[in-house]
């Protein structure tokens, strides 16, 4: 049996290899609470474009609320390097079309994986369009999200789009707990 990959160690090695350079990163964010720690951490090493694209959120008013909360967080969070905001389109029809027939699949199953790929594909496309150095997602911070599957999808899309995927498991080293500390009580949902 192969050893399980340690994505946090891979991220540590990538950061150590930057040697003080500040590359650009497209960071897909699922929500403000999950992005709080990730932004605090990665803004030390990257100039970040935060990409909010989550057509799985319903209704549209909730989506807009989350966009506003994401922007508020970016403006209130001290960052070492710049963080800009890039909203993606709200296209819930795409999500429902891709997951049709999977409505009863439990959390952590194939429906989640389809949703991961939909969001990461859009992130890879945006990173390529903006000519950024890397892309990644905040999704791995959640204890409910499968970091191995997220990184597998990210690596596959990196090869397809020619933009390196920044492997990660942000829940490691207390990342999830730190995101709770950084987020107001009303933010304790994880998407």
Locations of the language-model features?
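Divalent-metal-activated hydrolytic enzyme cores
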Residues: 173-185
């Amino acid at each position: 049996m192969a050893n399980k990959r340690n994505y946090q160690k891979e991220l540590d090695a990538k950061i150590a290899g930057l040697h003080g350079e500040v590359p650009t990163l497209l960071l897909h964010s699922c929500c403000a609470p999950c992005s709080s720690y990730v932004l605090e951490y990665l803004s030390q090493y990257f100039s970040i474009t935060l990409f909010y694209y989550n057509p799985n959120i319903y209704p549209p008013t909730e989506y807009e609320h989350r966009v506003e909360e994401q922007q508020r967080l970016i403006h209130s969070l001290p960052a070492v390097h710049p963080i800009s905001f890039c909203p993606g389109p709200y296209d819930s029809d795409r999500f429902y079309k891709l997951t049709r027939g999977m409505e009863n699949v439990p959390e952590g199953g194939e429906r989640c994986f389809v949703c991961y790929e939909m969001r990461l594909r859009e992130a890879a496309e945006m990173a390529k369009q903006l000519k950024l150095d890397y892309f990644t997602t905040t999704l791995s911070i959640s204890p409910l999200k499968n970091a191995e599957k997220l990184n597998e999808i990210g690596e596959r899309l990196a090869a397809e789009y020619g933009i390196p995927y920044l492997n990660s498991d942000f829940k490691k080293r207390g990342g999830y707990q730190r995101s709770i500390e950084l987020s107001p009580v009303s933010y304790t949902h994880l998407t």
